[in-house]
A protein has these predicted regions:
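Von Willebrand factor type D
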Residues: 78-337
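Secreted, short cysteine-rich peptides and small extracellular cysteine-rich domains stabilized by multiple disulfide
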Residues: 25-79
Length: 337
């Protein structure tokens, strides 16, 4: 009986210690371009950890740009109904909170974000059924230019979808790279300015560009239900595996451009018509690049020259941010009351 009491006491102490450790978890804001720089933010008791082996569980997330410097619980997958998202065929939600569609063209690349020190392009795939005036399109790949490096991720083409197969492919500076198919497995670039973390063992990752962006990515197919509802007429040899993406940006310059990037400009006027069910934005010629890893579009401002970067960049004055424009006043910062 005495042994049982002792064992019970030990178990209780261990459990209490684990609880206190979980309760004490938090996030340190290390990005110098965020409002909460060098602050340690406590995690909620409901989600005491920043990681989870089960992707269905919420984790602790501290938005170091928020003036309150508080954490919240969130899923680690793209939210296609929040600012910074690019999902479906393709539907974007800008930094200003406005929904718009940009169809582009199948098998061509377009600038999604172009800043002085960051370029993000998207490759569009799709097809045009007989009798249609335009292509049905989806984002199949992303290309990044950053710190003299080139990085890409893409959804591999497949005729039929299999959840047990990883459809993600990665390259870094022209070389294929492999990220172990294990939940929470991580890859870093040599200088640790790019990080890939698997949220699940297959088809879901978070890419972090140091001090610039966080990108949550899922690979999904065009399902039979999607095909039925939208009359895509998907061929039998391709389920159009594509990306669902949500971007979070830091320290964007006032001159940022690109299909999505320009919606973070402080003075941007979105051409999407309000009140329209599917507001479509054009301008393909302005955003088209010659390849996934090029910065040669008409509106591209990315430069690998530090001199040019400094001439374009301007210091962000957080105190002067205008939160009267809706969801975001620019610079990748979402304003909330």
């Amino acid at each position: 009986m005495e042994i049982s009491k002792t064992l019970l006491l030990v178990v209780s102490l261990v459990a209490a210690t684990c609880f206190l450790q979980a309760k004490a978890a938090g996030v340190y804001c290390s990005n110098p371009y965020t409002r909460c720089y060098r602050k340690y933010i406590q995690c909620p008791e409901e989600c005491p950890s920043t990681t989870a082996m089960n992707s269905k569980y919420k984790v602790c997330y501290a938005d170091c740009d928020r003036p309150t410097c508080k954490s919240q619980c969130r899923m680690r997958k793209p939210n296609c109904n929040r600012p910074g998202s690019a999902c479906y065929d393709p539907r974007f939600i800008g930094g200003d909170g406005i929904v718009f569609y940009f169809h582009g063209k199948s098998n061509e690349e377009f600038s999604l974000v172009s800043d002085s020190d960051l370029q993000i392009n998207g490759r569009f795939i799709g097809h045009r059924p007989a009798g249609r005036a335009r292509d049905f399109t989806w984002i199949q790949a992303l290309g990044f230019l950053f710190n003299s490096h080139k990085f890409s991720l893409e959804a591999a083409k497949t005729a039929t979808w299999d959840n047990e197969v990883d459809h993600l492919k990665f390259t870094f500076d022209g070389q294929d790279l492999s990220v172990p198919e294990e939940t929470l497995s991580t890859w870093y670039s040599p200088n640790k300015d790019i990080k890939i973390e698997r949220v699940t063992s297959r088809n879901s990752v978070i890419v972090t560009i140091k001090d610039k962006a966080e990108i949550m990515v899922n690979v999904v197919p065009v399902t039979k239900e999607d095909d039925r509802i939208h009359s895509y007429k998907v061929p039998s040899d391709d389920c159009f595996a594509h990306l669902e993406v949500q971007f979070k940006f830091f320290n964007l310059s006032p001159k940022v451009d690109g299909i999505l990037g320009r919606t973070y400009k402080p003075d941007f006027q979105n051409p999407a018509k309000p009140g329209v069910a599917m507001p479509v934005v054009g301008g393909e010629d302005s955003f088209k690049t010659s390849s996934l890893l090029s910065n040669d579009c008409k509106t591209c401002i990315f430069s690998e020259s530090q001199t040019e970067i400094e001439s374009v960049k301007s210091k962000i004055e957080y105190a002067a941010l205008d939160c009267t424009r809706g969801a975001s006043s620019g610079y990748g910062i979402v304003c909330r009351k």
